[in-house]
Amino acid sequence: MLGKKYQPCGVIVSLDGTDIPFDHYIFDVDPKEEYKLVIATSPGGAEYIMANSPLKHPVIGPFKTIEDVDHADLGELYTDFNAFPVIVTGQGENPDTKVLMYALKKWGLEKLCIEAPSYCTHLLQQGMLDEYFINYSMVFAGGQKSPGYASEFGHMDHPHADFLTLGIHESNFIFTRQKIRYGVTNETDLSGYKY
């Protein structure tokens, strides 16, 4: 396994902590799976989390500068899989992305796979995104970013599709063709999904 952990470390980034559902199943992964989940937020977000979450949250920071991180002992990341560390950067309700990325690297996280398009955009604006990939699912679901966003499908009633064609035009344009499969519902209830 090239010295890497079996499970990647998950990082939830939130401006103020109010958008984190602490009853989500990601906070209920069996500790034997050794899945580590970290929350990154602002000082205001850390206050909200400590006041509103029933979970165990050791606080790492706060860090206003890279020098603050240099002088800190972050401790070992892959311990106590029942705890969800909160790494605090920035001031007020504004986390500091550059300080966060520096702290994550110091913690041993060399590569990050960012799922959220809005956070990828934020990293691009900061000049901090080296590469990106597009995850293209054949499940017609989603919210305002998907076709038919005004009346999106739920996780139990979405149509599926099969790839028919995947093509490329020069080096910067991909096109696809899909065959819709209707009536494929309730294949997997994602609300019960466990890691």
Task: Name each model-derived stretch.
Residues M1-Y195:
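Enzymes that bind and transform nitrogen-containing heteroaromatic metabolites
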